Amino acid sequence: MNVMQENQIKLIEHIKQGVVQAVGLEEAEVPEILLEVPKDKKHGDYSTNIAMQLARVAKKAPRQIAESIVPELKKDNKLIKEVEIAGPGFINFYLDNAYLTDLVPVILTEDKKYGESDFGKGEKFQIEFVSANPTGDLHLGHARGAAIGDSLANIMKMAGFDVSREYYINDAGNQINNLVLSAEARYFEALGLDSEFPEDGYRGADIISLGKDLAAKYGDKYVHTSEEERRSVFRVDALAFETGKLRADLEEFRVSFDEWFSETSLYEENKVLPALERLRENGYIYEQDGATWLRTTDFEDDKDRVLIKSDGSYTYFLPDIAYHLNKLERGFDVLIDIWGADHHGYIPRMRAAIEALGYSPNQLEVEIIQLVHLFEDGVQVKMSKRTGKSVTMRDLIEEVGLDATRYFFAMRSSDTHMNFDMSLAKSTSNDNPVYYVQYAHARISSILRSGKEQGLEVTKDADMSLLQTEAEYDLLKVLGEFADVVAEAATKRAPHRIVRYLNDLASSFHRFYNSNKVLDMDNLEVTKARLALIKTAQITLRNGLTLLGVSAPEKM
């Protein structure tokens, strides 16, 4: 718990005692006291609507209640500088900013751990994201999902949740059969033999490379074997080739997973039919027209869903249900699935299935990743300059850089369409959001290097009470909000709140820097305090950027 959080608790307790004295309630009767940070600094450091909450119980107007509480709040509290009533009965608090300087040694001590909290209390979450078919390159939607999923996992972990990241390998569907047939055709082609290319095959350059690899590895060994034997071998090689490519691309994107879960394993380990039987035992399965149905309309889905078709084949829904049952049986409290925009209609049926299995539908959360459109110089970009085909994640990283790609994808809420401005992402100006934040970190690093060259090291023993200017206090206030912002971003599943915070922090630092001389050899004690202050800003910028998978450069 940091200084800011401790003071919030103290302030809430002080308000509670003020209510007890002014209104005559017992402590247990006082409703939960909520503190908000006003958007306009003129309205104080914190505000509470407790007077509105008490109006019905006290049978008085909120402002009248506030007027009776405020005198109690002004009594004997060193933390509070001023209290005022606003509007219909809001109570605004202006704090004595001196307490803010206590943050500096705390941040310097916690360093990489600054921002961590036990807010999540170890609740077990699994985040499944990307999960692209192992049949080709990752596209822009996958890239956005990867950036948001990984950032969210980092944020929730820092906020005290127990988080596991998972990639679901769709390796049991018809698309894998097409992959194998495509690899087979390219294998024959690499050996100089005629072969009919499958109508729904994959024609990418990667499949040509795969065919050449197979020819180099096996020679003509599988030319004259049975189709079954050849395709069984090629299936293993093709999946290893494609998943290896996915892993490499994601690792380059600074995204890693705790588990790569194979859909095929559900069948190999007999996980599918037991899930069906559980649904049947719970009374939600029926047979109609030769098919097996799940009665999802019992759980607000718009129609019931087929699990087994009349020809005996499974729909995609049945193994998906088995997979989610497997997740829950592994002990996760909540599952977060990050899906593409085309899966939005799938949410009600999956939540219905979770409930039909006997779990709470609240144990499944779904975050939808909306579409991405690329623009350069105001013109939409649809094709890669390099390949002449659709732009892939790899293409975008090569064009604008890894840091810009990660940061830009985290800037917007996942459920909003995104226009990705490539020109802006490549610019080296303060108009570029990631450049602006990284430049603040680099500038601080430069000042610290200059100080070190003059024999000035950052120390926790500096006299922080010398930090007294408005810009210093404003910077300290923003620094003190970090852990709360992380917890809020975790709760709201909103990495873009970290982006917004980093922009605010960079702005506060730049304002401080423009109005305060840091290295003043004629005033060494103030210089030492300011060096410690900017070091805390550097730490916090770095920690925030790390959550987003973005580097914190020391030189630019």
Swiss-Prot record:
It is found in: Cytoplasm. A motif ('HIGH' region) lies at residues 132-142. Its EC number is 6.1.1.19. GO terms for molecular function: arginine-tRNA ligase activity; ATP binding. Keywords: Aminoacyl-tRNA synthetase, ATP-binding, Cytoplasm, Ligase, Nucleotide-binding, Protein biosynthesis. Belongs to the class-I aminoacyl-tRNA synthetase family. This is Arginine--tRNA ligase. It comes from Listeria monocytogenes serotype 4b (strain CLIP80459). The gene is argS.
